[in-house]
Amino acid sequence: MEGGGGSGNKTTGGLAGFFGAGGAGYSHADLAGVPLTGMNPLSPYLNVDPRYLVQDTDEFILPTGANKTRGRFELAFFTIGGCCMTVAAFGAMNGLRLGLKETQNMAWSKPRNVQILNMVTRQGALWANTLGSLALLYSAFGVIIEKTRGAEDDLNTVAAGTMTGMLYKCTGGLRGIARGGLTGLTLTSLYALYNNWEHMKGSLLQQSL
């Protein structure tokens, strides 16, 4: 019976030692002096090779609410594609309206459906081609101005819009160039004002206080 009791105690002690409760074990001080093979620990409690903590690339912590901005070249693809698809949808709706208006005296038949479909595709392509060309010119001028100045700000937006309007209306003579440049200047200035409205409002409030 004694042997059985002793065996039971040994088993209990072994399980307790395995789970970290009771029995003889190693203290934290003893473990702190054990060297880690192939490692150069920074502290006794660091069980990770410091070589894995080295970053190969630079990483920056941005302020709260700040986002990484994209350049003109990255935004050019989104601008051109978005303008083409959006205006193509509006052009298709306008073509549907015109097609229904022009064929209102015709009965619902295959010729009428074909005529309406032709009007929808024609208007959608026309509108998409027009605004797509403007978006392409605007993006190209924006990229060129950004690379030339080495900065990205609202001045690039206004300058690119003005030059786009001037080039698009260059076939209309000096009056057409002036009219197109003024239109581009006005639209891009309003866009820049809209983007900076909150900042301008905060600045005015600080000055008033």
UniProtKB/Swiss-Prot annotation:
GO terms for cellular component: TIM23 mitochondrial import inner membrane translocase complex. It is found in: Mitochondrion inner membrane. Keywords: Membrane, Mitochondrion, Mitochondrion inner membrane, Protein transport, Translocation, Transmembrane, Transmembrane helix, Transport. Pfam families: Tim17 (PF02466). InterPro entries: Tim23 (IPR005681), Tim23-like (IPR045238). Signal peptide: none annotated. GO terms for molecular function: protein transmembrane transporter activity. GO terms for biological process: protein import into mitochondrial matrix; type 2 mitophagy. It is a multi-pass membrane protein. The chain crosses the membrane at residues 73-93, 125-145, 172-194. Essential component of the TIM23 complex, a complex that mediates the translocation of transit peptide-containing proteins across the mitochondrial inner membrane. Has a role in the activation of stress-induced mitophagy by protecting PINK1 from OMA1-mediated degradation and facilitating its accumulation at the outer mitochondrial membrane in response to depolarization. Belongs to the Tim17/Tim22/Tim23 family. Component of the TIM23 complex at least composed of TIMM23, TIMM17 (TIMM17A or TIMM17B) and TIMM50; within this complex, directly interacts with TIMM50. The complex interacts with the TIMM44 component of the PAM complex and with DNAJC15. Upon mitochondrial depolarization, interacts with PINK1; the interaction is required for PINK1 accumulation at the outer mitochondrial membrane, kinase activation by autophosphorylation and PRKN recruitement to mitochondria. This is Mitochondrial import inner membrane translocase subunit Tim23. The lineage of its organism: Eukaryota, Metazoa, Chordata, Craniata, Vertebrata. The gene is TIMM23.
